[in-house]
């Protein structure tokens, strides 16, 4: 079969949806299928190429609205060659982008069976006239896609619940996932020793944060919490991997706060493997954070807010330490408790790892998608 993934943003742009698409496309190829990815144009990258994995990529002209966070497809994109590829099944990533609307309408017109896979649990914009306009647009986009008749799926149960906001009953889940064996290999290949590189004592606890550096993700509050811990006699270091508007301010804080910028994926895995805990104090409308899955795969103790996917991966306090507040003082108290009892922290991490391996692997997710595609192809 020829699978086509429509994803408005794709690698090398970092992000969970981008890696989700890449991982499923690779599983398509491994199973003997063909994988196409249709995404937005990026400066310096060709309109069409086949990458090192064998994934065929189409980049359609788009305007980089909101500093590239919301690419808007330009009218009448050159796609005749795409539709000539004999696409058997399409996966349309996310419900909100203009490319998603275009892809759904084109797939219906071309008679290509498809599903829509959503990754969020909230509106893209909040507050004021812009927030109201954004909500109106999202409902309009969903209504257009719904009219095409394709089933909607969510990457977590929370996403499926959020889809009801748009009058959509999800057909099922295609959860975010990881490959534990692949991550273990990345952790051991030419590892970067973060403690040695930054002249930390071998026993110094490392707290890791991986994500976009925007206020909703909580990195700045976490940095303040770590500063408070050190002032109160708990020596520890915070390593922040990611980019965004808060990056420069975080860099200026200096030790024990280390803003590393964007890291290659192997180094993110190595950081999680070496960390004493991974902290995600997010208040963002997450879908199912990939970093939580990767931390669980690395057996890194997790400290997190209740966010999308946590109820499935980390059902209760025996799997992770949950935050009831993201205030720096509350973060500091939660981290202090985790660092003070590493045995309990690692017992939780082992439970999270076991649950991950049972339910959240790419092999399992692709098997579900492949079965769905085969059934849809027969009906068409």
Task: Spell out what each predicted region is.
Residues 113, 122-148, 153-154, 161:
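Nucleotide-sugar donor phosphate/pyrophosphate-binding loop at the beta->alpha transition
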Residues 273-287, 300:
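Acidic donor-binding loop of glycosyltransferase active sites
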Residues 248-266:
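Nucleotide-activated donor-binding/catalytic signature segment of Leloir-type glycosyltransferases, i.e.
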Residues 292, 301-304:
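Short hydrophobic beta-strand element within catalytic cores of glycosyltransferases
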